[in-house]
């Protein structure tokens, strides 16, 4: 534990320094992505306009836990206060990553390497590192992971419920948590944990749903029914065909939920296929994890693989989603961990090349090629993590092999008995 905390103390100043480097970083006035939207939601709430009833909100209710606190510093300081809050989430995540590795008995070298890489991640994430609220659910997922490893199962499920209320993606981690707790503590503990998850999520959502049930439903529905977002894997293949003159891509700006989607029958079909692939990718991780020899040691790997599958094949992709992956990927050890970190870093850096040239991407120009490479890197990341997970599954011998081994064992025992009898009669 002391080694873990020392590693975190060393990494935190590095992290804060890295947060100040990108455009829109810590101590910088510029802001990007959706930060102005967060401020608008928070200020309208304080002015008496209720979210989901008077104002359409595209984010889950749990997001207001980080939208509202920066308003305490005034409208003119919301930008700096929000970035500071996200930096604090990052600091807490570094501490938790160190504690997770300490729980797993990681070596000092691996521990320092993991927190060091996490500390440098704002350089690769760029402006999105502090200008979106994704550091909040990312922190909660690592906290839940640590609690599960500490056998604080009910608290772990409760934190997952809070994470789901802030961003829906942690739902893919729930079956993994159920498998882990079931194999260690039995189904009753799983039931209690799931009850805690539902209770926490309900406590967060209920106040909003009480006065605006239709608005909350519309917020979730609008997200679920989004089309093929331009940065998704499926869209990148259609954009490639467009560049080759084999397809006429049409990019449209969506209302309500801000974004740029591809429109048309082909795009709709690819979006449907993406949902199927995403479900299969995540379910594959669940099945493989259910068969691992050591569920405790492999839980961080399974968390990383499930989130990677969710992101790689989704029909809606935004670059800030990669912030969910970083603290989980650095927990993966061995050769797979090195490969996973390298692929994640490459995907992050590549996305920064066109970050300030999104207009060119929406006009279907040169960033299309880089987009395809980035998306394929994420597919490769998923493959690496699933490959590592599959190598740790329980090997169940077939009945024929079992019978053959049993027969050989009986034959060996018979010959041993004969040999001993001959020796005694002599």
State each model region's role:
Residues 222-226:
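N-terminal leader/capping segments at the start of a protein or of a new domain
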Residues 39, 43-44, 52, 56, ...:
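Extracytosolic (periplasmic/ER-lumenal) interhelical loops and adjacent juxtamembrane/interface segments
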Residues 65-75, 246-267:
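Juxtamembrane membrane-water interface segments that cap and precede transmembrane helices
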Residues 1-221, 268-426:
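Multi-pass membrane glycosyltransferase architecture that uses lipid-linked
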Residues 227-235, 268:
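Extended ligand-binding clefts on enzyme/binding-domain cores
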């Amino acid at each position: 534990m002391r080694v873990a905390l020392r590693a975190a103390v060393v990494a935190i100043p590095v992290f804060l320094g890295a947060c100040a480097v990108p455009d829109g970083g810590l101590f910088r006035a510029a802001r990007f992505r959706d930060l102005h939207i967060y401020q608008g939601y928070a200020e309208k709430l304080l002015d008496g306009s209720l979210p989901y009833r008077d104002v359409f909100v595209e984010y889950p209710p749990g997001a207001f836990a980080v939208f509202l606190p920066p308003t305490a510093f005034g409208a003119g300081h919301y930008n700096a206060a929000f970035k500071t809050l996200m930096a604090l989430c990052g600091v807490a995540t570094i501490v938790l990553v160190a504690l997770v590795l300490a729980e797993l008995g990681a070596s000092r070298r691996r521990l320092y390497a993991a927190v060091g890489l996490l500390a440098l991640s704002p350089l690769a994430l760029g402006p999105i590192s502090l200008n979106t609220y994704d550091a909040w659910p990312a922190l909660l997922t690592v906290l839940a992971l640590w609690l599960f490893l500490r056998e604080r199962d009910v608290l772990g499920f409760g934190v997952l419920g809070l994470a789901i209320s802030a961003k829906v993606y942690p739902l893919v981690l729930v079956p993994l948590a159920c498998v882990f707790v079931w194999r260690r503590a039995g189904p009753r503990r799983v039931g209690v944990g799931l009850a805690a998850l539902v209770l926490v999520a309900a406590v967060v959502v209920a106040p909003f749903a009480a006065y605006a049930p239709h608005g909350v439903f519309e917020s979730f529905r609008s997200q679920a029914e989004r089309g093929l977002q331009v940065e998704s894997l499926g869209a990148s293949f259609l954009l490639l065909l467009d560049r080759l003159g084999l397809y006429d891509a049409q990019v449209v700006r969506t209302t309500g939920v801000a974004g740029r989607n591809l429109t048309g029958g082909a795009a709709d079909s690819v979006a449907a296929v993406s949902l199927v692939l995403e479900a299969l990718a995540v379910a594959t991780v669940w099945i493989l994890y259910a068969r691992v020899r050591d569920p405790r040691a492999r839980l961080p790997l399974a968390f990383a693989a499930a989130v990677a599958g969710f992101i790689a094949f989704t029909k809606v992709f935004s670059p800030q989603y990669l912030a969910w992956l970083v603290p989980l990927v650095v927990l993966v050890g061995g050769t797979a961990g090195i490969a996973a970190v390298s692929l994640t870093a490459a995907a992050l850096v590549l996305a920064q090349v066109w970050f300030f040239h999104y207009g060119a991407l929406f006009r279907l120009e040169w960033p299309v090629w880089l987009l395809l490479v980035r998306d394929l890197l994420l597919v490769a990341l998923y493959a690496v993590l699933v490959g590592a997970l599959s190598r740790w599954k329980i090997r169940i011998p077939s009945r024929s092999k079992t019978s053959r081994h049993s027969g050989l064992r009986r034959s060996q025992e018979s010959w041993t008995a004969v040999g001993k009898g001959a020796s005694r009669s002599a």
